[in-house]
């Protein structure tokens, strides 16, 4: 979506503090809008993780690793995209930049906290994905074990029968029971 649309409207209509404050406040508002967009994206992935978890427990014999891998790849991409923002905000706060007022550094500190929250949530989601991989593998192993039980049962029945057929199906004349009358 257009995350800067609200900011453009405020600038055009002279609403809010944006027109009254300096350019450093505009930087804060723009960065804050970027960070807020990550919350929407993380909400989407939280729903996706919940759906994957439900599917893992409903469809126990299906392999969900491709979906998990896809979400993990997206979360890695998200983390890599927000990491530079952390450094930019930190430099804006710490370095002596004349255009950044001390009051705006307080706002930037707030945005930096939000960036750290987003990074932490991404890390939590990736750990959750690891748990989902383990759960998926446990379900697949359980399904495989049940198949092996059935195959073991079948082989237990047919191995003795195969042995008897093999012994009595041999073509030789000196077998003790071949010439008996019973």
Where are these regions (language model features)?
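Hydrophobic alpha-helical transmembrane segments and their immediately adjacent juxtamembrane loops
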Residues: 113-182
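Peripheral, non-transmembrane regulatory/ligand-interaction domains of membrane transport proteins
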Residues: 1-103, 107-110, 114-121
């Amino acid at each position: 979506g257009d995350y800067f649309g609200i900011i453009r409207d405020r600038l055009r209509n002279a609403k809010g503090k944006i027109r009254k404050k300096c350019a450093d406040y505009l930087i804060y508002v723009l960065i804050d809008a970027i960070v807020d967009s990550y919350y929407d994206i993380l909400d989407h992935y939280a729903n996706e993780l919940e759906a994957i978890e439900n599917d893992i427990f409903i469809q126990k014999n299906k392999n969900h690793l491709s979906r998990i891998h896809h979400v993990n790849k997206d979360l890695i991409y998200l983390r890599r995209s927000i990491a530079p923002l952390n450094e930019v905000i930190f430099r804006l706060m710490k370095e002596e930049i004349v255009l950044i007022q001390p009051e705006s550094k307080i706002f930037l500190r707030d945005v930096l906290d939000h960036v750290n929250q987003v990074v932490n949530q991404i890390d939590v989601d990736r750990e959750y994905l690891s748990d989902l991989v383990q759960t998926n593998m446990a379900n697949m192993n359980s399904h495989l074990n049940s198949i092996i039980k059935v195959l073991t049962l079948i082989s237990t029945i047919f191995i003795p029968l195969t042995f008897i057929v093999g012994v009595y199906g041999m073509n030789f004349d000196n077998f003790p029971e071949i010439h008996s009358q019973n």
